Amino acid sequence: RRQSIHGIGEIVQRAEGMILKADLHLHSCLSPCGDLSMSPRAIASLLAERGVALAALTDHNSALNCPAFATACARHGIAPLFGIEAQTSEECHILCLFPLVETALELGKELYERMPSIMNIPEKTGDQVYVDDDENILGEVDKFLVTSADFTVDGLAARVLELGGLVIPAHVDRPSFSLTSQLGFIPDG
């Protein structure tokens, strides 16, 4: 049986009676909207400077920078969650959060296999690199990460819950890539 998302509950219990600063939607140099200065190490350092206690790395359709994020967060005393901002077949962006790096990587592999073979063109859409904790580039993702995977909102949510994760709709206040902009409503459940 997989570990559940109980790690969040433990963090909140320790923070009872005080304000807990968290950021659950962060992109790194892996996402084409990011740049090379946004390594997991640099992100964790900035989060620590700002007093953030809980953070989730949620690159587009991939978790390949989550291992470096885990190490960087441990160095700074930040409780990490490991995630993905998945793009569904309806073009909704959904945050998928996990307490374990391995589970986020597993979902990332499934998403990548379900994405169309639209290749990234770094000169036009930006780099998509994953790095180690020393900021050495380990590789570059070939497919363009900001495309829809062959997962419906309901199918993705079911899979994330099956893996012991947490599902959060992204961009709830935006006119694009949100549940309401794409579906016209927020589904039950």
Residue ranges with predicted function:
Residues 14-15, 19, 72-189:
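Extended substrate/RNA-proximal surfaces in nucleic-acid metabolism proteins
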Residues 1-2, 14:
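Basic polycationic patches enriched in arginine
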Residues 7, 12-90, 183-186:
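An N-terminally biased module of ancient metal coordination in phosphate/nucleic-acid-related enzymes
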